[in-house]
C-alpha cells in the first residue's frame, strides 16, 4: 500500500522530529505546513483532519497558523472517556501539551476515546481469515499483519483502533457522539471539568458489527472490481 501511494513517499522525514518542547511552542515540519496549506485552500465546508496518533503535527499547525481553527474539524482518536479515572493513553501521553491544546484552543473537535469506545472494535484470526484473506492484495496484507502481531492466537482478539475515526466520517450513526463541555487535561493526565468551557463532541461507543461489516464488504468489492 505504501509503495503504491505517492503521498507516503518520504513520510518519515515529513512529520515532526520531536514532541512540543513546551506549551505554545510548535514543531515545524512538512506535515504541519502541508496541513496549513490544505486548511487555507479554497473549498466548500471544513477540512476534516484525522490524527490517529499523538497530536503533535495538528497542534503545531494550529500554533503556527491559528486561522485554521475556523477551517478544520479534528477527529482524534486518543485518551479515555471524560468520566474515566485517568485520561492517560498511548496517543495522549506521548505529547500532553499537544493533546491539551486540542481541548483548549476551541477547534471543532470530535473526540473518540479509546477505553470502552474504540476498544469495541475487536476482531479475530478466524474472522480475518474468512473476510480479509483472499480479498486482493490489500485483504491479504491486512490478514498477514494482523496474524503477525503475535504468535499465540488462542482465545485472542485484537482492537483495530484506527478505523473508529474513519467510521465516524463514513456514518456517524456507527460512532454515536454527544456534545459536552471540553474537559481540562490536568498535569496528572486526568480530566477536570468546567461547565463554562466550549463544547466538543465525545464518542460514547462504536457499532462494532456495522463498522467491520462495511470494511469487509468494501474489501470484497475492491478485490472483485
Q: Where are the model-predicted features located?
A:
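Short, functional N-terminal and low-complexity linear motifs
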Residues: 1-5, 25-26, 65-69, 130-135, ...
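Short amphipathic alpha-helical segments, especially helix-boundary/capping motifs
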Residues: 7-13, 31-37, 73-76, 139-143, ...
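Conformational coupling and interaction surfaces
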Residues: 90-100, 105, 109-225
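Metal-dependent C-N hydrolase catalytic cores
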Residues: 1-42, 198-206, 210, 216-220, ...
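Generic structural signal for short, solvent-exposed loop/turn connectors between secondary structure elements
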Residues: 2-4, 80-87, 186-188
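Active-site histidine-anchored catalytic micro-motif
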Residues: 17-125, 207
Amino acid at each position: 500500500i505504501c509503495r503504491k501511494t505517492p503521498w507516503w513517499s518520504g513520510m518519515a522525514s515529513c512529520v515532526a522530529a520531536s514532541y512540543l518542547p513546551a506549551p505554545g511552542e510548535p514543531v515545524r515540519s512538512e506535515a504541519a505546513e502541508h496541513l496549513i496549506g490544505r486548511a487555507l485552500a479554497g473549498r466548500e465546508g471544513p477540512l476534516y483532519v484525522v490524527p490517529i496518533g499523538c497530536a503533535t503535527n495538528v497542534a503545531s499547525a494550529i500554533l503556527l497558523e491559528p486561522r485554521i481553527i475556523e477551517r478544520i474539524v479534528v477527529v482524534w482518536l486518543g485518551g479515555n472517556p471524560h468520566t474515566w479515572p485517568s485520561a492517560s493513553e498511548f496517543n495522549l501521553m506521548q505529547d500532553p501539551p499537544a493533546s491539551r491544546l486540542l481541548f483548549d484552543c476551541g477547534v471543532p473537535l470530535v473526540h473518540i476515546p479509546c477505553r470502552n469506545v474504540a476498544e469495541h472494535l475487536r476482531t479475530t484470526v478466524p474472522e480475518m481469515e474468512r473476510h480479509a484473506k483472499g480479498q486482493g492484495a490489500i485483504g491479504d496484507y491486512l490478514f498477514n499483519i494482523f496474524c503477525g502481531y503475535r504468535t499465540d492466537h488462542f482465545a485472542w482478539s485484537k482492537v483495530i483502533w484506527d478505523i473508529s475515526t474513519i467510521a465516524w466520517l463514513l456514518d456517524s450513526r456507527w460512532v454515536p457522539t454527544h456534545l459536552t463541555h471540553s474537559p481540562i487535561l490536568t498535569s496528572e493526565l486526568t480530566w477536570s471539568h468546567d461547565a463554562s468551557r466550549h463544547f466538543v463532541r465525545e464518542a460514547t461507543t462504536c457499532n462494532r458489527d456495522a463498522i467491520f461489516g462495511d470494511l469487509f464488504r468494501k474489501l470484497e468489492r475492491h478485490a472483485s472490481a
